[in-house]
Amino acid sequence: MSIIYDDAPLEDRIHRALSDTFKHRAIETAQDVITGKRDALVAEVDNWEDFRTHAASIRDHVLENLDYYVRQFATNAQKNGAQVHFAPTDNDALDCILDIFEAEGAKSCVKSKSMMTEEIGLNTFLESHGIKPVETDCAEHIIQTAGNAPSHIVVPALHFDRTSIRNLYHEQKGYEGTNDPEEITRFLRKTLRPEFMNAPIGVTGCNFGVAETGSCTLVSNEGNARMASSIPETQIVVMGTERIVPDLRSLDVMMKLLVRSAVGAKISGSFSINTGCRREGEADGPKNVHIVIVNNGRTDILAHEFRPIDRKS
């Protein structure tokens, strides 16, 4: 299933984007901040390029042995109580996820930021079946409210500034506050908290799946991913086939690179390693975990010159 945000011809969209000076300024400012922070942190690491080379070798090793590691990950995830589903295509993934919603009788869910769900067009698909997905990442909530597509893989609302966000929430959500980011965040927290508490299903992505433990990891700066994966009774993890690392030691290497490279920080605000369903005596966590592993052309790429895409994704 493809996802369409704008029916206008490509040429019209290009001219519209090139003439939008507001978005140009917003994107340039945000990119300058992120790039500056990243460069400063990278300069503190003497062996940064060695780290990158080591991480690339880990990713290459996994891709060369992908069948083995996917099987190991799935086996260990099942031992932890999770149900693992394999989806060859985006439509297979959507049908699988819909089956889970229907089995649970669920008509809504909370979501954490996930480019995998963006790739398969999950929100549009769920809405077409009468299911309400609620984005809980601040930036994702902004673009969902605006009906926009993400403008950046890490910072999806890069094309908004604080004033446009304030005006958007005033028009769409009745927000009466200022354009102060902290005040807007407090409004979002108050708005989203009931959604977390009442949602029957939480949908998340997966930064890395750990083969030796069957764990799914989540990185966020707002804590929303942890809430989406711990409060609802059912969690659906949607991940690409290539998102596997062999073990926790390899995960450590990838994490040291990920946050520095993505947002110019030493560590994220929240990092979770989720291993299966809630166990007896535990106060939170989902009773049911479904892991949907999506191929959608990823293994086809391994045989071609574009193979490095799988390593870097």
List PLM regions with ranges.
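Conserved small/polar residues in nucleotide/adenosyl-binding loops
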Residues: 313
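The feature marks the mature, well-folded catalytic cores of soluble enzymes
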Residues: 1-308
